[in-house]
Amino acid sequence: MNKGWLELESDPGLFTLLVEDFGVKGVQVEEIYDLQSKCQGPVYGFIFLFKWIEESRSRRKVSTLVDETSVIDDDIVNNMFFAHQLIPNSCATHALLSVLLNCNNVDLGPTLSRMKDFTKGFSPESKGYAIGNAPELAKARNSHARPEPRHLPEKQNGISAVRTMEAFHFVSYVPIKGRLFELDGLKVYPIDHGPWADDEEWTDKARRVIMERIGLATAGEPYHDIRFNLMAVVPDRRMKYESKLHILKMNRQTVLEALQQLIRVTQPELIQSQKSQESQSPEEAKPANSKTVAPESTHPDGADEPASQGHTTATQSPPTKSKPVAKASASSINGVPPANPNPIVQRLPAFLDNHNYAKSPMQEEEDLAAGVGRSRVPVRQHQQYSDDEDDYDDDEEEEVRNTNSAIRYKRKGQVKQEHAAGAADGQLSVLQPNTINVLAEKLKESQKDLSIPLSIKTTGGGAAVAIVTHSQPSPTPSNESTDTASEIGSAFNSPLRSPIRSANPTRPSSPVTSHISKVLFGEEDGLLRIDCLRYNRAVRDLGPIISSGLLHLTEDGVFCPLAAADGGKSSPPSIKPGEEAQVTIKLDEKEGSEASGSKEKELLALLKCVEAEIANYEACLKEEVEKRKKFKIDDQRRTHNYDEFICTFISMLAQEGMLASLVEQNISVRRRQGVSIGRLHKQRKPDRRKRSRPYKAKRQ
């Protein structure tokens, strides 16, 4: 097996697939492009590729050079996984194993776990023999290597000595017991670079060591060689995003339950009217729906957008018939007949039952201004993706379909207007995105000082609702995921508008928009030109809070963080003293209805932020799945054997009588350009020496 190990390319996709073939779970490999930028998130180790120029490399022996940084203590060396490279072309496997087998919080799988247990306490040489005699490792790594070309015998002797010494070598940098070690299989001992500072991560020290090695720190003239590569072994981002999505979806359900509980306490008449609506049969809903379409289309406030109201019959229906029409639209869009005409679905009251939470708020604004119906199918397709080995796409698709028409809410301003005027046939309208911007901005301002609890007193019963959140993400393995999803995802992958388009103020062209804002907030048109970038900043700031812990709504109406996620993929991070803030929402009978509206606005803004974070993480998860598919495609192209195709093509040229002419033409072109072919270049030097000796003798 000593001559059966093929060379591996320094490609993060190749190493990621190789880790999977080894049986390791929850690990991937990424390439580092900037050594001067701080590494985000946990890193298990670095794999560094550099040009190997030592003369002793050709003898394939372990170097015996020892300096002051070498660790010669056998107890320390044998207790870590450090193996001598005894097989050529195995440095990539040695570097990868040196990172994985020195980590305690990685699921190694059966193969590597058995090797780690078997070689515990072995010397580096014995561990090197263990790697060389593991057929599972050789088979896995050779399956991702490019097939070696078949060299002609005469070409082997023509390689110069300078080219023979040019080779590349993999080493690893791993943190072990508070110190940074460089593990090189061609050196007899590991190299200890010492501990890192208290105010920095181990990756910061590793980056400095690598920069000094390649000469970037001194910017010297001899260090202009850029033929090096650095890769990081990190946790699998797919699992991290799935865990975050699980927490966010649980929190979304919790906030929805809190909103429903609030409506039951503050406005019980809406719950009673909803029950009366559900008791009516679908047959009575159809004629009532047809009667109300014409008055809505001729409403004076909605004159600027008749097309939008004409296409959205289901969402613009009267309060008494909104539920059956929503069901009918959902079944017609999905193309699947409903199994039960009256299914038992957990719904929000009419106050919150007219908004589509599965749709982007910015897309709603654009659709409303453009006159496009809200039940468009392409809007929901941005979350549907599939992968052969991943099974989470089906759940996402079902959830998007269910929430598209079932979860809607009735705007609060219309409820106030109906209560004041006593009208029985009020108008329904969707809450505009510019009002959502104001809600998020107010919530952001209220949480600037997280040490001060926020108390909002409203009318209703005596129950108390306390929202316990975190002020910053916990320094656990998902420390950087929120920044990635909120900042990068919102700019590139989020269904929200891009910052360039969001820089324009929201459109106050419709009088309906102005009327809704005045009813909700009692303010003038100045709020209509809120910059959407402020909403994006609010979402980014609230992202670490709503996605770092799993909230639970108890029976007595209190939000509390769970100690462990029940049935979830991961438990929420631990709560440290001083790192949590309580937003207490009390229901008091002495206060008026204005405080109730402010509390509902806060919960709606929080719900919007949760939805935005879910959209961001779903986009990031989809990107990681697509990246993994591209890794497999590149691997198939790399490992495919093209010899059969080439031989078939050459034989076809020979049958057509074109091969001889092409070969002769190619040889003549190379001779004119001075390019040597075959043995012609090798025979010139001996001939030149034989002719020079008699020439010198004649002159003497």
Curated annotation (Swiss-Prot):
The record marks 184 as: Important for enzyme activity. Residues 273-346, 363-405, 469-513, 674-700 are annotated as: Disordered. It comes from the Eukaryota. Residues 273-282, 317-332 have a biased composition (Low complexity). A motif (Nuclear localization signal) lies at residues 688-693. Gene3D superfamilies: 1.20.58.860, Peptidase C12, ubiquitin carboxyl-terminal hydrolase (3.40.532.10). Residues 641-669 form the ULD domain. This is Ubiquitin carboxyl-terminal hydrolase BAP1. It comes from Gallus gallus (Chicken).
